[in-house]
Amino acid sequence: MESSQMSNVFHATTIVCVRRGDKVAIAGDGQVTLGHTVMKSNARKVRRLGRDGQVLAGFAGAAADAFTLFELFEAKLEKHGQLSRAAVELAKDWRTERRLGKLEALLVVADKETSLVISGTGDVIEPEDGIVAIGSGGSYALSAARALMAHTALDARTIATEAIGIAGNICIYTNRNVVVDEL
């Protein structure tokens, strides 16, 4: 990408989802970057979805695309009432409706039983170890969360929070202003 184009690209965010015991937590940083400039340091990229707020969600990618992905997923969740079914139905729409195209965003969603990554191209992925991370600092957060899970007795919320903090120390597009929610 040319440097003139690069200066107009939004870089955001790091999201991590951690399961331990009967708890699941999703954490995200608060930084939104345009080119080489931090535009906002306290953005909220983690929220609750569904009628009773029993689904956690966090997004990374282009903000407008992420909000579109949120809305599409939440509509499926309202209609079907179950996380996995809503994700599969959304993926089916991608395969049949050309108008959806390609959204440049990723969504992590979790309820008490399941964690999923939903991509802006209609892919649905379930992590095998209960830990998933997306976004610019996702690799760092994933590594940190896996190490903390393997070598400590910390709870899901603390692991998620610490993983974002560690990613924020390494990734220039991630800060340590953490928002975390837990079921």
Swiss-Prot record:
Subunit (UniProt): A double ring-shaped homohexamer of HslV is capped on each side by a ring-shaped HslU homohexamer. The assembly of the HslU/HslV complex is dependent on binding of ATP.
Family affiliation: Belongs to the peptidase T1B family. HslV subfamily.
EC numbers for this chain: 3.4.25.2
Name the job this protein performs: Protease subunit of a proteasome-like degradation complex believed to be a general protein degrading machinery.
Catalytic center at which residues?
A: T13
| Chief localization | cytoplasm
* Keywords from the named record: Allosteric enzyme, Cytoplasm, Hydrolase, Metal-binding, Protease, Sodium, Threonine protease
Q: Where in the cell is it found?
A: Cytoplasm
Q: Please name the top-level EC class of this enzyme.
A: hydrolase
The gene from which this protein is expressed is hslV
Name any Gene Ontology BP term: proteolysis involved in protein catabolic process
What species is this protein from?
A: Xylella fastidiosa (strain M23)
PANTHER family attached to this UniProt entry: ATP-DEPENDENT PROTEASE SUBUNIT HSLV, METALLOPROTEASE TLDD
GO terms of molecular function? metal ion binding; threonine-type endopeptidase activity
Q: Which CDD domains match?
A: protease_HslV
This one is known as ATP-dependent protease subunit HslV
